[in-house]
Amino acid sequence: MSDSLIRLRPWPDILYVSQGRAVLATDRDGFFDGGSQRGLFVHQTRLVSRWRWLVDGRPWTPVALSNVDQGSWMGYYIVLPPGADPGERDHGSGHMKADSERTLELRLSRRVGDGLREDVDLTNFSQQATRFTLAVEVGSDFADLAETFEGEERQQKGELRRSWREPGELAFDYRAEHGQAQIDRGLVIRIEQAGSPPKWEDGRISFQVELAPGASWHCSLAFLPRISDLVGAGLAPAREGVNPAPTFREEAASFSTPESETLAPVVIGALMRARRDLADLRLPDLDEGERSWTMAAGLPLYIALYGRDVLTASWQAGLLGPEMMDGTLRALARRQGTVVDDWRDEQPGRMLHEAHTGPLAVLGFNPRARYYGSATTSGFYPVVVSELWHWTGDRERVRPLLGPALEALRWLERYAGDNGFFDYRTRSSQGTVHQAWKDSPGAIVDEEGRPVEPPIATCEEQAFVYVARLHLSELLWWMGEKDEAKRLFHQAGELKKRFNDAFWMEDEGFFALGLDAQRRPIRSITSNPGHCLAAGIVDAELVERTAARLFEDDMWSGWGVRTLSSHNPAFNPYSYHRGSVWPVENGSFALGFLRYGLHDRLETAGRAMFEAARLFDHYRLPEVFSGHARDAAHPFPAIYPQANSPQAWSASAVICLVQALLGIYPYAPWKMLLVDPHLPEWLPELTVRGLRV
């Protein structure tokens, strides 16, 4: 094991506690004062913008603060008891401070659930009685998460009312309108079990406290959100000790390995962390049943349903069980496009890209309450239906999903197919410009680093349609739809031939990023062709050269495959899609290397990812990290400034990498599990328990 002291953490200045739709984001001291992205958020709405405990108007000194798990947190704070003599300054070896020798302790315990519960415990560890005012500063603004970013202006103009109700409830009520839309949200902070009566004055809840030596004082605060404009989001406290996914945690596959000096303990740590993170990102309000659920894409920015993200995460994590695939497929089927609505980039059959519940989306300042601007989601949906079939062989479970899968393919053929390939463009005034795998505004550049404007047919989108047709044809054959199965099978073969002819660049030994509006190759060297390997669209004679190009120095950082070649003028190791490294991509690429028997490439990619995981707190890979070269000057990668962590598809990438190393693939319709392990020396042994096929 490494004795390195490197421990990386995204968002190093913010502490997060989260469960479901609720996120508590504080400064490093456990409090917050209305700063950027800090507060208690429920459904992307900042219900509490200021929260700070004081003793006689003075701050507490934090001495130990930590998450207990993703949904709970505890902090220790101390001060010298008010009125106590600080005494002489200590100059001995202990360098003792007065507040550590005569201590008034504040212990805060928080659990996030449907809302928040905070338990407040005071203990007088001094040898004299003390009297003081304990107070907490409270503020609320009901800002959308996006409005809390530094430099962002507030768009919604609502009415906020505040009221105090005896014996101890502080209520905030907020209403806003925009066009025909309106929201009605609120928060009650209820004081329970208080050791002395509360008082509300000048933005503070205060208590008069008297403590004898060794005595304690307690109160509990329940934060009860009200989101009346959303169905199923009502008033409820945080539920102490509630596990968001108990059945999954009991039944999901688990992993172990003997202790050794190899990477094996890191692999196990990363696997078990990923397993927990996926459960912690669960969105209970979207549950389709105890064994059928989906998750948010990532914390803190993506606590929402993102179609392609959760489709990817659910199939990559299939080794854990089918619950996520089942719940995700059903949740998206319920939200499949039905009409032509250019504002939302919606068309019949198109699969949802994202669904937000914050004020700006619900009020219609943007189309994100239900937005369809992704080509990838519709291509992925049939693939994941097929994966669910391969893992379960359950006709009753899969058959209702066939219709939505076919409609998603028909959408691609009707709205995205052009001249034999599949492209994208937005029709919305606030739509996503790039709607393929890489969807940031500057993601698509040519070999000179110049932006390319849609319509664009990217290489990976052709691969996704290919594998969707191929896998769905097999499933339709099983279901007796043989004519449609034959049609899709032949279409897949024809697309593969056209793709290899049109996208291959012989002089580069690689595939073009895409075809532009004039169907000219976009000749930039990117990670996108790695997805083509994963999907199996690459002709056999081109596989070795394609894989080798991904591992040349300009593409391989030493921690993973970069999104864009470092030789491209637009390369930036910090850019979202122009030079960074994404664990989710490298997880998919691993299955591509396995598909073509490239075990050396698989081992290299896997080792790099787990060596990266070793550098991060809890072995938790973030959404994306920088593409700096791994060398003596760069002993660890930087982190993309806005990276989510945990991120669903970074967690699933870890599971996917191990599945590839184990050579596991299920075929439940034939009651078959294929196992062809190629474990490297850094992972000599691995035990999987509870695998369900």
Q: Which ranges hold each PLM region?
A:
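Inter-helical turn/loop segments and adjacent helix faces that build the functional surface
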Residues: L388-P400, H471-R487, F593-D600
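TPR repeat positional signature
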Residues: S314, S378, P382-V385, Q462, ...
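Terminal accessory carbohydrate-recognition/targeting modules of carbohydrate-active enzymes
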Residues: M1-A279, R291-W293, A297, L301-A304, ...
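Aromatic/His-enriched, Gly/Pro-containing loop or helix-boundary segments
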Residues: K97-S109, E159, P197, P348-G379, ...
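Extended glycan-interaction surfaces of carbohydrate-active proteins
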Residues: V79-G83, Q208, E261-L305, L329-Y371, ...
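Hydrophobic or amphipathic alpha-helical targeting/insertion segments
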Residues: D119-R131, V384-V398, A405-W411
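Alpha-helical support elements that line or immediately flank enzyme active sites
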Residues: D309-V340, N528-A540, N586-L602, G606-M609
